[in-house]
Structure formats: C-alpha cells, structure tokens
C-alpha cells in the first residue's frame, strides 16, 4: 500500500510530506483501518537494559518529537518507540527549508534544530497515550540558547520531568544541528555531565521506586581515539546503554550530489557503514552489561542483521521508513530472527 502512496508523497516538500504522513497514520489508526494497510509483525521477545521488548526493532527519535502519535506508531509493529528530542522550553528550530530528501540515495539531510513544543507539552501527550505495546523511550536535549556550561541544568530538568512516564531516557549529545552540542562528548566534559545525570537518575529512582535506564546517543563522526575515550567514560559511569549513532556531517558517497553541500546531518543508506563501524568499536570497548542500540542506515532486513552482528542488542530505523514504508519493520524483525536461528543452529551443531 505504501508503494502506491509514496510517489504522491514525494511530490511534496520533504517536511510537508513528513507532516502528511503522520496525519494519515493517525487517521488510519483511529478509523481502525491501519491493520488492513500494514503487515502483522511476529513477536521476537528481546531483553535489554532490564526491559522486555516484544521485538528488537524500534523507531528512532525525530519522527514524533512531541509524543503526539505514540499509539499509531506502535500499531505499525515496532517493538519500542523513542520520541523527542524534547527540550526544557519550546523552540522553533532552524529556518526552513531544513529537510532534504535524496531519493536515489535513500537518504535525508536535516538541520531541524530540535524543533519541539517543550518537555511539558510532551509529558501531557505521553500521559494521554495508551502505549501498551512496548517500551517507550524519551530523548532529551538542551535548548539552543543554553550555554554548554549550563547544559546539565537542561538535561536534569528534562530527566526529572519525563522520568515517571519513560521506560528509558536517551541523552542526546550528538545532534549536529545545535551549535556546540557535540562538544559535550569530549572526555572530561562527558564525564562531568554523565556524573551529574547519574546522580539525578539515582535520586529519581529512589523517589519513584524504579530504575529508568539512561542511554547516551553518540555521533558517528568521532575519531577512533575519541570513541575509545567516550567508551571509558561510559563504562566508568555505568550507563545503562548507548545508541550508535546519530546523523553524520560528512557526505559519504554523495560528493557529486547537488544537495551534498546543504548543512545538516545525513541519515539513510550512505550512513550505514560509518555508523556500524562506530557501533562495532563501542561493542569491543564496552562490557556486555552495557547494551547497544544500532541505528543509522537501516533500509532493509540485511542492514538490521549487520547491526546485530556488530554487537547491537536492539536496532532503530527512521529514514529507511521514508523509502520502504512500514513493511521495513517486519522485514527487519524477520532478518534478525533468521540470524538468531542460524546462530542457535550453529551452536547446536558444534556441541
């Protein structure tokens, strides 16, 4: 069905197409028509960060920034949903145009800039959602006019506001579209920031009587030495998990494309190799007690399998959905299932 809808959608401005897709999804969900338009996703129970997931394929942050489409998105078969990025105060984001579709490359360049209605609006939306289908992650960031020296205040405020409603919280330090944000990944800065957030997490756990996992979302553009340094900090601070990776400011395989010079983060198929290398390096430098989510460039089931082979416990997709539609979710689940079955069969044959 999506293959019929996509050509019409792609005649629209990219950001307008995004909005139309979400409105159409909501209409289909509330009318009861969504099951007729999507394929059933078979369960593949998975555990990570101490949470149970109906399957290991989730939606990455960015599609539903304000938590207004949670139930409809879960109905597409995702094992978990991550909403946001949300910030303490509402902000409009960067000037338009700020979202660019590269159809032949199955890629998108965005410089959205954390446009959102603010964490209080998100909390109200989450409180009104049913979300019984799987874990809900909430991705938090800082406002663009908050100096890095005060960034921990923004992250702590958001963490305190979403803690009671989230199944896990992601600390977004890696968007390339907020000036200076990625500097927070520098080793000593990262150590101080995560230390403060871990203290807040422990205080909130005592207050609410439950531990909500805290994940760190990393950039794909770090050098090997920077990745290793970040891994040391993440291990020392005993974070619950890591998401690898966000979008890239490099332009792999796109040098001749007319949109390659647009500022912003690149996602989609060209990011797959780069993000998977970062994922694999983090896996080799972090203990198995720290689960990883692999995201970046997943456009087919084989891509999801590659993330799992590189050490991911879970995967997320977003840009791939723009080009493949909701069927990508089930395709990824089945690819991971086949990989797990093959691995299990191999172990049995060697015993």
From Swiss-Prot:
GO terms for biological process: 'de novo' pyrimidine nucleobase biosynthetic process; 'de novo' UMP biosynthetic process. Its EC number is 1.3.5.2. It is an enzyme of class 1 (oxidoreductase). Disulfide bonds: none annotated. Binds 1 FMN per subunit. FMN binds at residues 61-65, 85, 139, 172, 217, 245, 268, 297, 318-319. It is found in: Cell membrane. SUPFAM superfamilies: FMN-linked oxidoreductases. It catalyses: (S)-dihydroorotate + a quinone = orotate + a quinol. It is a peripheral membrane protein. GO terms for molecular function: dihydroorotate dehydrogenase (quinone) activity. Pathway: Pyrimidine metabolism; UMP biosynthesis via de novo pathway; orotate from (S)-dihydroorotate (quinone route): step 1/1. NCBIfam families: PRK05286.1-2, PRK05286.1-4, PRK05286.2-5, pyrD_sub2. Catalyzes the conversion of dihydroorotate to orotate with quinone as electron acceptor. Belongs to the dihydroorotate dehydrogenase family. Type 2 subfamily. This is Dihydroorotate dehydrogenase (quinone). The gene is pyrD.
């Amino acid at each position: 069905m999506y293959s019929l809808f996509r050509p019409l959608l792609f005649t629209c401005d990219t950001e307008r197409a995004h909005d139309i897709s979400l409105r159409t999804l909501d209409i289909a969900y509330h009318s009861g028509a969504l099951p007729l338009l999507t394929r059933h996703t078979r369960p593949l129970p998975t555990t990570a960060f101490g949470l149970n997931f109906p399957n290991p394929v989730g939606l990455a942050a960015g599609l539903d920034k304000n938590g207004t489409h949670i139930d409809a998105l879960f109905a597409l078969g995702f094992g978990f949903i991550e909403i946001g990025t949300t910030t303490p105060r509402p902000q409009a984001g960067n000037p338009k145009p700020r979202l660019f579709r590269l159809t032949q490359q199955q890629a998108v360049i965005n410089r959205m800039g954390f446009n959102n209605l603010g964490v209080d609006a998100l909390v109200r939306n989450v409180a009104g959602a049913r979300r019984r289908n799987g874990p809900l992650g909430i991705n938090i960031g800082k406002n663009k006019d908050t100096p890095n020296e005060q960034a921990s205040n923004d992250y702590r405020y958001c963490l305190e506001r979403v803690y009671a409603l989230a199944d896990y919280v992601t600390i977004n330090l890696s968007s390339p579209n907020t000036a200076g944000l990625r500097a927070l990944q520098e080793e000593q800065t990262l150590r101080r920031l995560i230390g403060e957030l871990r203290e807040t997490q422990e205080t909130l756990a005592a207050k609410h009587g439950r531990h909500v996992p805290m994940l760190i979302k990393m950039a794909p553009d770090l050098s090997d030495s920077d990745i290793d340094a970040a891994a040391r900090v993440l291990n020392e601070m005993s974070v619950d998990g890591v998401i690898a990776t966000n979008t890239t400011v490099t332009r792999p395989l796109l040098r001749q494309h007319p949109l390659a010079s647009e500022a912003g983060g690149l996602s989609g198929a060209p990011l797959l190799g780069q993000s998977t290398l970062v994922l694999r390096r983090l896996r080799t430098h972090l203990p198995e007690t720290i689960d990883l989510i692999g995201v970046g460039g997943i456009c087919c089931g084989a891509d999801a399998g590659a993330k799992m082979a590189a050490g991911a416990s879970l995967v997320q997709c977003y840009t791939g959905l723009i080009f493949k539609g909701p069927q990508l979710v089930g395709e990824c689940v089945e690819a991971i299932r086949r990989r797990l079955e093959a691995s299990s069969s191999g172990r049995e044959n060697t015993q």
